[in-house]
Regions:
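Residue-level signal for alpha-helical transmembrane segments in multi-pass membrane proteins
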Residues: 19, 23, 50-53, 77-80, ...
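Physicochemical signature of membrane-embedded alpha-helices that form the seven-helix bundle of GPCRs
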Residues: 5-15, 36-42, 66-73, 97-108, ...
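Membrane-embedded alpha-helical bundle segments of multi-pass proteins
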Residues: 43, 48, 63-168
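N-terminal signal-anchor/initial transmembrane insertion module
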Residues: 1-107, 227, 254, 259
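Chromatin/DNA-recognition segments of nuclear transcriptional regulators
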Residues: 231-240, 247-250
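Multipass alpha-helical transmembrane domains of eukaryotic endomembrane proteins
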Residues: 122-229, 248-263
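Short, intrinsically disordered/low-complexity patches at protein termini
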Residues: 242-243, 258
Length: 263
């Protein structure tokens, strides 16, 4: 029987998932004046149904990563609808309206919270929490990283730094790629094997992909925004640099190079 704290966390997870679905669907519905767009909230239904099925029996807990995959696919589709196209909805955002830029930023920031609630309320098992806690924090930081890059696009409409549209589209593409990569760490736990060499190779490959495709790319984009357009991003530049260094240490430890001991 789950503790009351876990039950509260599960209730919050379900509530925030529904709230985010409604809020994101409201942007195309309001700005395109078409109520049928509210049906986009159904993009989160597979994640909700799968989560309910897993919560019904703790034996299904190893499949929790599939909930995140279903969620992140729906989340990326929402982002492409709002930020993509020749005339994106984010260009039409009105600060005077409830569903304006500030509400959109807060709605996007729910993604890391939803991730932490999903992983931390799966079970009362301390063994499970010890295994998942470090991974969930790292994933949440990368999600915040991606959301902050989307905020650069939103804020460009409020205070222009002269960032060209093609560069904004490049930011959007890399953000979506980083979100799609986010389930890799959870999949890695699911695919753990007794063969130490295979496990280390897979973990090293995943870490290298995340360093290159997420933090290195975002670091490059932020430095370009800073040097080319005067966009201050010093905090997240430092974050990307720190994560890259930690990731390189992890890869060295896994591969036993540079005098590092493997684990």
């Amino acid at each position: 029987m789950a503790s009351w704290l876990v039950c509260v966390g599960r209730f919050l997870f379900f509530g925030l998932l529904g709230l985010q679905a409604y809020s994101l669907a409201s942007y195309p519905a309001k700005y395109e004046s078409e109520d049928d767009f509210y049906g986009l909230a159904l993009l989160y239904v597979p994640a909700m149904c799968l989560w309910l099925y897993i919560m019904w029996d703790d034996k299904n807990l190893p499949w929790l990563f599939a909930v995140w995959i279903c969620y992140i696919l729906g989340f990326v589709i929402f982002i492409l609808i709002i930020f993509g196209g020749d005339k994106p909805i984010e260009d039409k955002l009105d600060k005077a309206k409830f569903f304006g830029p500030n509400n959109l930023k807060m709605t996007l920031c729910l993604a890391p919270v939803i991730l932490l609630l999903l992983l931390s309320t799966g079970t009362d098992s301390y063994r499970y929490r010890d295994q998942i806690w470090q991974i969930s924090l790292r994933m949440a930081l990368d999600l915040f990283d991606g959301v902050e890059m989307l905020e650069v696009i939103i804020e460009e409409n409020e205070v222009s730094h002269g960032v060209p549209k093609p560069f904004e589209k490049a930011i959007l593409a890399f953000v979506c790629i980083s979100f799609i990569f986010s389930p890799l760490q959870l999949v890695e736990i699911k695919l753990r094997t007794s063969n130490r060499w295979i496990y280390r190779c897979r973990e090293g490959l995943r870490t290298a992909l995340q360093i290159i495709c997420v933090n290195c790319v975002f670091l490059g984009l932020r430095i370009y925004l800073w040097r080319g357009y005067g966009k201050d991003a010093s905090i997240f530049i430092a974050k990307n640099a720190i994560v890259i260094c930690l990731g390189l240490f992890e890869v060295c430890s896994i591969s036993k190079c540079c005098g590092c001991d493997g684990y």
